[in-house]
Amino acid sequence: MAVYAVGDLQGCLEPLQCLLEHVRFDPVQDRLWLVGDLVNRGPQSLQTLRYLYSIRESLVCVLGNHDLHLLAVARKNELLKKGDTLREILEAPDRDELLRWVRQQKLMHYDAERNIAMVHAGIAPQWSVKKALKQAAEVEHALQDDQLYGAFLDGMYGNEPAKWNNDLQGVTRLRVITNYFTRMRFCTSDGKLDLKSKEGVGTAIPGYAPWFSHQNRKTRDVKIIFGHWAALEGRCDEPGVFALDSGCVWGGAMTLLNVDTLERHQCNCDAVGNAATGIIASAQPGNAHIQQIPAQEPKQ
């Protein structure tokens, strides 16, 4: 059995299928991990969600900010933003079935056997794996509980509080947990968030740094797979931390990582997130040489 992790899809189905065909993914035997942002901005959000639902027994997904935005928009259509490509999902006859499935997904996955965690954006540096799983479970419970669901989504948006405090309660508590897992890039060593800066690692404001670079980070003994940060272009120099968002929806590439061998594969994308007619690049871990392989035609 092979386990593959793939970066942000954002409704880009063609490059995902291209990569899965390239590695000969078998949904009966293999497993596919997804770092979240399954939908939005790309050209095939509905088709992507339907495809993932069809292979759901082979999937491990964590939710990203765009997935949570989909759930919020499904409650209140006026929340649609310029550039959203969610309308087709909202008008689909199977929308309720698809949205119920999205609600059941995690904010954090931890494979104890491999000692690997997967999140969309990151893990607060002051949290251990045990603490992070506990906080993620609070949001997961709110998503799955009909009595808490609406209040959570209504209060989810916002940048405050910027820092975790164990005494936080209610929606305010859930908001900061959500921001760590789905929106974080830069923070201070004690976890104060800067949610406005979105460029590369060298653009941090004084006192802030990429969440994974803090020396006191309590998850340094764990491998972490994450997405969200397209400006990193799928590169992270921090040992044991694997960035998989390589900007597919912006004309970059979609990245697939073999979780056990750490071999990477990339499918080039065009400006709207379709698989480009170019190549798939494959590279062994620690090997700067990239082999160029013609991309296969994605399945329809």
Curated annotation (Swiss-Prot):
Signal peptide: none
Keyword Hydrolase belongs to the record: yes
Entry keywords, A to Z: Hydrolase
EC number(s) given by UniProt: 3.6.1.41
Gene3D superfamilies, sorted: 3.60.21.10
Enzyme class: hydrolase
Recorded catalytic activity of this chain's protein: P(1),P(4)-bis(5'-adenosyl) tetraphosphate + H2O = 2 ADP + 2 H(+)
Any one GO molecular-function label of the UniProt entry: bis(5'-nucleosyl)-tetraphosphatase (symmetrical) activity
Hydrolase is among the record's keywords: yes
InterPro entries registered for this protein in UniProt: ApaH, Calcineurin-like_PHP_ApaH, Metallo-depent_PP-like
Highest taxon, organism lineage: Bacteria
Its job: Hydrolyzes diadenosine 5',5'''-P1,P4-tetraphosphate to yield ADP.
Family membership noted in the UniProt record: Belongs to the Ap4A hydrolase family.
PANTHER family named in the record: CYTOCHROME C5, PTHR40942
Family annotation (NCBIfam families): apaH, PRK00166.1
Protein name: Bis(5'-nucleosyl)-tetraphosphatase, symmetrical
Taxonomic lineage: Bacteria, Pseudomonadati, Pseudomonadota, Gammaproteobacteria, Pseudomonadales
Name of the gene: apaH
